[in-house]
Regions:
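Short solvent-exposed beta->alpha transition segments
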Residues: 29-33, 37, 47-95
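N-terminal secretory signal peptides that target proteins for export/translocation
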Residues: 1-2
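Bacterial N-terminal signal peptides
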Residues: 7-17
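Generic anion/oxyanion-binding catalytic loop in active/binding sites
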Residues: 11, 20, 39, 57
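Cleaved targeting-peptide boundary
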Residues: 20-32
Length: 141
């Protein structure tokens, strides 16, 4: 009987772990889709679509999709018109989720961008800001 209970608990823990992994996979795919769509929107100068992925805090501070596009053009050229980009992992840092993306700009400079993601009450993921790092040693596949 004890062996059965132990096996039952073991199988239950494995199932819980598999469910958590599956939930993370679904979450990460949703986050990646948001970031990818915003990058695509920038490539087409679709400021409304790009701005639609911004969190309420970002929208409140910038106030319009036109201003948002201008800000990205001027401050984040590597995101606005990258030579290439590659989505990396989704990371949890201090209870916040980040989509990591490697970018190469038009001058061949490399950047690692951390997109801070924020889950909304309706379940959608929004971008709550980015943090940029120079990524001299990162290699693109």
């Amino acid at each position: 009987m004890i062996k059965f209970i132990t096996q039952f608990l073991f199988v239950g823990f494995i199932a819980l772990g598999a469910n958590a992994w599956a939930d993370d996979t679904v979450r990460d795919a949703a986050i990646s889709a948001v970031v990818t769509d915003q990058i695509d929107a920038f490539s087409k100068d679709d400021s409304e679509r790009a701005f639609s992925h911004a969190s309420p805090m970002v929208k409140a501070s910038i106030r319009s999709h036109e201003r948002f596009l201008t800000m990205v053009k001027n401050a984040y050229g590597m995101i606005y018109r990258p030579s290439s980009h590659e989505l990396q992992e989704v990371r949890m840092i201090e209870d916040k989720l980040y989509q990591v993306v490697l970018f190469i700009d038009q001058d061949r400079n490399r950047f690692k961008i951390f997109y801070q993601m924020q889950k909304q009450a309706n379940g959608e993921w929004k971008i709550n800001g980015v943090t940029t790092f120079t990524a001299k040693n990162d290699v693109f596949a």
